[in-house]
């Protein structure tokens, strides 16, 4: 089996998901990611991920400059507590950004972005609400 996502994997590696497969084998060998196109287009679009610094309990907003070099931030932003090991980058232990700032609209407004796109990953009928400029708004 190419992809392992299991309790066995969690015990063996400390991660429920096979991170070597997800962040190295898949984008570098099996379904090669077009890093050159990403790097050419980054001058037109900023790409950020949100991670949580587990020692400070604060969000980390990482701007990706080179997808291959910065893949650790993508991994950290998807590393869920209890089923993933910390991802250590730049002297910090990082996990999923949802732990500290699940919908970082205000953070990006502080960075100067006036419009933000938020993609819901669940049925809109779940009652999920997002605080936008002091008002609760369903997105």
Could you tell me what each predicted segment is?
Residues 3-139:
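Patatin-like phospholipase
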């Amino acid at each position: 089996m190419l992809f392992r996502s299991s309790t066995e994997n969690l015990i063996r590696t400390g991660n429920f998901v096979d991170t070597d497969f997800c962040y190295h084998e898949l984008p570098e060998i099996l379904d090669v990611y077009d890093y050159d196109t990403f790097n050419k287009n980054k001058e037109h679009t900023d790409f950020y991920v949100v991670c949580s610094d587990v020692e400070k309990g604060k969000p980390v907003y990482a701007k990706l400059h080179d997808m291959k070099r910065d893949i650790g931030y993508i991994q950290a932003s998807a590393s869920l507590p209890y089923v993933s090991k910390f991802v250590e980058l730049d002297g910090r232990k990082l996990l999923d950004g949802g732990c500290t700032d699940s919908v970082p609209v205000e953070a990006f407004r502080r960075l100067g972005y006036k419009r933000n796109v938020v993609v819901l990953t669940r049925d809109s009928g779940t009652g999920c609400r997002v605080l936008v400029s002091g008002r609760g708004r369903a997105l």
